[in-house]
Amino acid sequence: GAGCCDYSHIAPAAQQRFKREVLTGQLTNHAQPSGVLNGFDLAIDLEEETLEPTLGWRTRVRLGVGPDGRAGMRKARSNDILADVACAQVIPGALEGIVGPDARTFTPGTEIIVVVDSTGQRHVVETAKAQRGRRVEQIETVIEGDLDATEIVPVDVAGQVQEFDYVFPPTAFWQAHRAAPATYSRYITDWAADEYEQATGWDLYGGVGLFVPSISMAMGGRPRI
């Protein structure tokens, strides 16, 4: 399905309630029996934070291309392409000329990746269709923009803000919500800040190294990561 687009018609407060129910259900069924949640009351201790904006926040999207060359989101549990209506969660302007009645056409059977980076630059690339459950990193054609997107993430530690630049292909994974990278980095610097006998941190998230600066700053600025 279209992921967040399927969810966008629901009021934000209701979305948050549904997500909380899903999360607490999973934790209760799968984590609680192990004992890792001992002393933790899911009804009281689970904190929530809503990232703004709640609509029009997605900075990157992967589209399918139908036999007629028109791009769009896929229907739920189907390979059919919805080419007439753009996803409501994509940031304004990202899909202009890409999806809709007057949009351009692309190579049938390919996938189109659209990214709007921190500088406001739109990148549109064409790739081969990915196999189910896999990501395609190879760019076949650059339609607009560059081979690399630039993301700038501010990290605040003890009132001092530093900005970190990340440059990587539009096909690489990055948090889709425009506010997510800075928010998640803030949680790491807040929760992980401490005095450590051995300054070694593990970024198990991987990717392009989004959390390396926040881990480093939380551990005193000179850890091994």
Cite the ranges covered by each PLM segment:
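Accessory RNA-recognition modules of RNA-modification enzymes
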Residues: 1-225
